[in-house]
Amino acid sequence: MNKLFLLLTAFMATLQLNAANKYDNPDTLFVSRDGTAEFRNIDDAIEVCRAFMEYHKVIFVKKGVYKEKLVIPSWLNNIEICGEDRDQTLITYDDHANIKLAGNNKPMGTFRTYTVKIEGNDIIFKNITVENN
């Protein structure tokens, strides 16, 4: 009976450890707009990446149009964002310089109209189109 209890306890501890580290590995994360992958948005996949990773992480983005304003912060590095097809995998956003800022009603200006802002090091984009539409 004690052996069974010990075995069951060890098994449960292993499950909890694996659940806590689901995204903490060098594997590929998958993004798909149609819900057939772990994530529907690229930003959600970026959010689960660890700060100051020493390993390479790939975020594979399936074909589709992703209307997102992405920021890859300075504490993220070694990330490759790879599209399924460069002509059919699109990150887009529609800011422009004349949009009024909340609170002061001044124009946004061009420096705030990015679609993707990369502050981290060793960030690679492959086989994907980024546009500011």
Regions found by a protein language model. Give the residues of each.
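Right-handed parallel beta-helix/beta-spiral solenoid domain characteristic of secreted/periplasmic
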Residues: 33-35, 77-133
